[in-house]
Amino acid sequence: MDKVKGTNLGNWLVLEKWMSPGIFEGTGAEDEIWLGRKLSADKLAAKLKEHRDSYVNEEDFAFIAQYGLNLVRIPVPYFIFDDRPPYPGCAEYLDKAFDWAEKYGLQILIDLHTCPGSQNGYDNGGITGVCKWCKNPTEVEYELTVLERLAQRYGNRKGLYGIEVLNEPISWLVYITAPSTGKAEDKEEAKGSGHVPMPFLKQFYKDAYARLRAILPKEKVIVFHDGFRLGAWKDFFVREGMENVALDTHIYVFAMENFVPIHKPWVYQIYINSQKKAVEKAARYTPVIVGEWCICNRYAEKPPQKVMLLEEADRIRRERYQENAAMQLAAWNTSAGHIYWNYQLLRSRTEEPDERWKESWDLSRCLINDWLDYNK
């Protein structure tokens, strides 16, 4: 396969409230696990079925292929195989995704995005403020069996690029600075939460590789997230004799903005160049994919200082997004590939998100608005 040029189908099989909050309306839940706790099993199943049936369909795969992308990364929950009630499984939707991907010449990276007890305490890990999975050997083993079942079911599909073992297992530094830390709905449940230690993560990755490689054809890639520690891996995968693997790192300009008070293109360029060098250094040993990135930035959303026509303001916004996109694509094109987060937020492209800045997280809108051009 050529260099990975893809997009994520997040918020389809793994919910994230900020992306399309409508499904959570009236429940008081902040994440998918609590949605299941706030609703009856029947109501949860009905809500998820309605969402999964409508949020992504065949026309989206056609759209993605039309714009020259070659891969979709699909986050899936640990309960994909319908064995953790009350949460309905969703393997039948991933089955459809493979049919559509193969029809339009796309590859799929299956991304195991959550685990029982969470690996990061984010809403995208299933339950906000709780991060205890790595301390429960039974659930660690369960997660490995989910990976095995994914490999058995999809390993021989033509459209399978590979399987990502686990999304964003959190480091100590990221854990202590994450806004979600300390925001658990049930404080008792969150007791004992903490980061995922590097020795544990290395052993889990070795175990996951052994189980997956025993099932997957050798041409299928096994992908490992860097755990927010890109520079720590060095030659680990080489020393362990792992073949046809890749390292996934997630790079967001907007995250840098939380720590740097100046939001200007020259600051973004410095940051992007530093991340590019880090990716290139890690890639001396193992191919690196920038598995999540987007063009969201405060400079593009900053209102012009002088009053002007709406058309002129939109032009300035577009040019600022184009500049940021060009910077990032130039950098990430030196890696093994890049995967935009996310393909969409709201299902309807005519419906405005609740906050204007969210538009830049929606790749379909970025492409239609000419904010990003993969061919330049």
Give the label of every model feature segment:
Residues 1-69:
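N-terminal carbohydrate-binding accessory modules
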Residues 3-9, 72-74, 108-112, 161-163, ...:
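Hydrophobic faces of well-ordered beta-strands that scaffold small-molecule active sites
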Residues 10-12, 77, 113-117, 165-168, ...:
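Active-site beta-loop-alpha junctions enriched in small/polar residues
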Residues 17-30, 88-89, 117-135, 178-185, ...:
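Aromatic- and acidic-residue-enriched segments that line the glycan-binding/catalytic groove
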Residues 44-52, 78-91, 129-141, 169-171, ...:
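The substrate-binding groove and active-site-proximal loops of carbohydrate-active enzymes
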Residues 45-72, 82, 86-114, 124-162, ...:
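An active-site-proximal structural segment forming one wall of the substrate-binding cleft
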Residues 159, 168-326:
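Extracellular glycoside hydrolase catalytic/binding regions
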Residues 307, 311-376:
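Aromatic-rich peripheral "rim/lid" segments of glycoside hydrolase catalytic domains that contact
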